């Protein structure tokens, strides 16, 4: 959530109109998320995760930047910017031409080990909930 909020603020500061901002984010599979929440929320009680398999219309991977969009792709440290087609758009000084062919959850950097659990714990701690 903090990263998504920062993306919105950065987009508001840098937007010229028509471009698309894409957060550079680590990926995980649903089983990792379930396991992380089980570890974060479990208080010793039996917490079962049931695997049911793929359901209709379910995506295995999310395409965030297509190969066609990658031709118009710029990047900053934290996000990608897809240049709009046509118009007088020009990249900000902080942007460089991205050197990727596409960006999807299958090829994105993955959360490793207990990293996702730590990410969730840090976020929950930032909420100051007792």
List where the protein language model places each region:
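Strand-loop microenvironment adjacent to phosphate/nucleotide-handling motifs in alpha/beta enzyme folds
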Residues: 1-130
């Amino acid at each position: 959530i903090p990263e998504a909020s920062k993306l919105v603020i950065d987009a508001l500061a840098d937007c010229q109109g028509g471009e698309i901002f894409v957060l550079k984010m680590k990926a995980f599979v649903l089983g990792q998320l379930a396991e992380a929440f089980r570890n974060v929320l479990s208080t010793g009680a039996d917490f079962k995760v049931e695997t049911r398999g793929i359901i209709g219309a379910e995506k295995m991977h999310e395409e965030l930047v297509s190969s066609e969009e990658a031709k118009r792709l710029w990047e900053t440290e934290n996000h990608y910017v897809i240049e709009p087609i046509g118009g007088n758009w020009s990249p900000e000084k902080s942007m460089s031409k991205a050197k990727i062919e596409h960006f999807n959850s299958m090829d994105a950097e993955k959360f490793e080990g207990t990293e996702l659990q730590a990410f969730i714990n840090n976020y929950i701690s930032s909420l100051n909930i007792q």
